Amino acid sequence: MDDDDDTSFNNSLDLYCDEDPFDSTPPPPPPPPEQQQQAGTTTPDDIDDEVMEYYKAKQRCYALQIRDYCCYLQCHHLLLQQQQHGVAAARLKAAMGRLGLEAATAFNAANYLDRFLSINCHLKWEEWMVEVVSVGCLSLACKLDEVTIPSLHDLQMEEAMGHSFRASTIRDMELTLLKALRWRLACVTPFSFLPVTTTTTTTRALLLRSLLDPSFLRFDASLLAASALTLSSTTPQHPNHLLLNRLIHPFSQTDHEVKECFNMMKALHLDMSKNPGRSSDHPCWSPISVVIPFHTDGTVKRSAISRCLFGSGRLKARSI
């Protein structure tokens, strides 16, 4: 037995590597001075340029499938959908001010809403359908951007919405949205292009106000940001002017599109100047924003949601 122990001990010694544990492969030689100088010249502006180019390349991946969605609605006499888009966007904007959400949350939620509505533009949309979709979009955006996520009850604006939805209904809506949007939630919006240090309140308010008008949906996010930055820059020496040429993509945006977007944003800016209350994050609800309640019993409403939006009858037995 002792011989076996000695043999085992000797084998262990054979496996022992008698060398300094701190010895390692010698470090590689330093790069040539030219490379060190090039690496040292990388500035925050260069990093911003790379981020800007990345956003410009990706922005159309998060655009609507129907480029001129507003024109499509008008041509097909879908004025109710066009009207409900503005109402839903106004709710998102108001929720941002009421709950203290980040502006990025409102822009992302509006992007989810517009993409989902354009994908399902063949549906006959009703007020309650747009309501539950908008709440689902806002809930997903909060989970992506917010540190403190509001409850599903708080996300519903009882003073403006005609319905109050159960948490299970909103969670089902979230799954439907994720599938329809192919889980692409980290989207590129006009807010993505705004510089953190030089962005003014006017720029942010202009872009938030543009969410209410579906006519702006046909323009690239970078072009919308460039138009808002131009109007909020008081002098040609303003730092925002340096961004404009980088935001406008000459190969994908014609001069006509650039001028049209700028003129529309300018008209919006003038309207906000004449009516300062409209640019507030706490808009007053006009009669057009008051949704008429959908008067049916809970089972019919629940089955209608299931049939129209979820494509399943499994929710039929429960009420909203």
From Swiss-Prot:
Q: Where is composition skewed (Pro residues) in this entry?
A: 24-34
Q: Which SMART domains match?
A: CYCLIN, Cyclin_C
Q: Which domain of life is it from?
A: Eukaryota
- InterPro entries reported for this sequence: Cyclin (IPR039361), Cyclin-like_dom (IPR013763), Cyclin-like_sf (IPR036915), Cyclin_C-dom (IPR004367), Cyclin_N (IPR006671)
Q: Does the keyword Cell inner membrane apply?
A: no
> Where is the stretch described as Disordered?
1-46
Q: Name one GO biological process term.
A: cell division
Q: Which terms are listed as keywords in the entry? A: Cell cycle, Cell division, Cyclin
Q: Name one Pfam family in it.
A: Cyclin_C
Q: Which GO terms describe its molecular function?
A: cyclin-dependent protein serine/threonine kinase regulator activity
A GO CC term assigned to this protein in UniProt: cytoplasm
Q: Where is the composition biased (Low complexity)?
A: 35-44
Q: Does this UniProt record's set of keywords contain Signal?
A: no
Family note: Belongs to the cyclin family. Cyclin D subfamily.
Q: What is this protein called?
A: Putative cyclin-D7-1
- Please report the organism this UniProt entry assigns to the protein: Oryza sativa subsp. japonica (Rice)
